[in-house]
Swiss-Prot record:
It is found in: Cytoplasm. The gene is fdhD. GO terms for cellular component: cytoplasm. NCBIfam families: fdhD_narQ (TIGR00129). This is Sulfur carrier protein FdhD.
Amino acid sequence: MNKDVSLGQPIVRYEDGKLFNTTDQYVTEFPLTIMVNGEEFATVICSPTNLEELVIGFLASEGAILKRDELKSVLIDDSKGFAHVELNKDLGDRFQYSTKRMIASCCGKSREFYFQNDAAIAKTSMSKITLTPMQIINMMTRLQSASHIYQETGGLHNAAISDGLTFFVHRQDIGRHNALDKLYGFCIQRHITVRDKVLIFSGRISSEILIKAAKIGVGVILSKSAPTTLAVTLANDLNITAVGFIRNGGFNIYSHPERIIDSEQ
């Protein structure tokens, strides 16, 4: 059973020249240790929702699995903070001698295989999807309106996958990588093809987020914030359309603008 993603806690607030007691919503940090074939693989600090999706998406992002059929079983014991995964294969030497890792909620830079492993897994997009400006603006508006817990706490990252019209899945997490891993896990579980889908994301498009989008396989990533220079370089190299600063009825296209058409047809 999923735990609460946020909890009300007593605080002291200062406002209008006065101190007073009240309550506020805190986001929950939940450590989940992932065991693969009986061996400790990593501990992820996350929000305690959609944990099976998170585990599957995380393992796929790390290159431990490539498809749903490689999973024999996934058992979540959230009372003890463990995910027990059995694969229909061995992990192989690349993972056998790796050190135990703590993946913090704030970022992904503690990942042992950052860039070396990522380069082998990230996919060059062959997406044929096209979007109109109004589709882009409407998708970001919908993401923000769906993020009620962020509005209460200000502490969660939000992400969704869409075909430009319909949201297939929307997920939230304290960690930006976790939110995307949950989307990835959802799609793997249901054999959803994401080549011609769009990733909508509440945070900045960093190089790590761009690589994550490439691993998932989408052709377009939308964000209300700006990308980094390395993210734009990677987006151009991986044939991904990166759109940022989606706000107040406008946006910037940073790479592969051919997928954005100035027409409502």
